[in-house]
Amino acid sequence: MSIEAQFLVSFQLLLASLLCMLVGLERERRHKNAGLRTHMLVGTGACLFTSLSMYAFPGDDSSRVASNIVTGIGFLGAGVIYRSEDRVHDLTTAASIWITAAIGMAVGTGAWFLGIVSTLTVWFILRVLYHIRSRKHQYPQNGNGNGNGNGNGNGHGNGSTID
């Protein structure tokens, strides 16, 4: 691997780390199990694996590395999700880990603009839509105080949570 390619990959690693930091900060702010460091490590690792598969082994099929990244992140995400009584927790955090790997992979292939746009989209989904969801539960629509219309009083309707 040439020194120029190594400098390029180094830049990609820094960019992936910074982009994934934005996603991780949002999860950290919500006091989730996987926060800043986890998201940065996942994105940086996915970027490095992707870049290495392209630059270090140019004749090989780099899609095998990409598919294995996705599989590995699936196991990591499954470890974040937990269930207590009738509620499932941290599905959104698991999904954010998954998309963080995709952001790292995009940057690792040189699709920096796609990585930046994806990060901003994820940030919008996590941050802005969270506030819309919070307001929905803050102002009930059925008059019984829970905002879900089923009368169970927990505000979640089916007893599950996606955060």
Question: Could you describe each region identified by the protein language model?
Answer:
Residues 1-65, 112, 116-117, 127, ...:
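Alpha-helical transmembrane segments and their membrane-interface boundaries
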Residues 18-23, 75-82, 104:
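Hydrophobic transmembrane alpha-helices of secondary-active transporters
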Residues 29-34, 82-93:
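Membrane-helix interface "capping/anchor" motifs
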Residues 41-51, 73-75, 95-108:
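Small-residue-rich segments of transmembrane alpha-helices in multi-pass membrane proteins
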Residues 59-86:
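Alpha-helical transmembrane-segment detector that highlights a single hydrophobic TM helix
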Residues 73-78, 121-131:
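Alpha-helical transmembrane segments and their membrane-interface exit regions
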Residues 90-95, 113-118:
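Hydrophobic alpha-helical membrane segments of integral membrane proteins
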Residues 120-121, 136-139:
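A small-molecule sensor/coupling module
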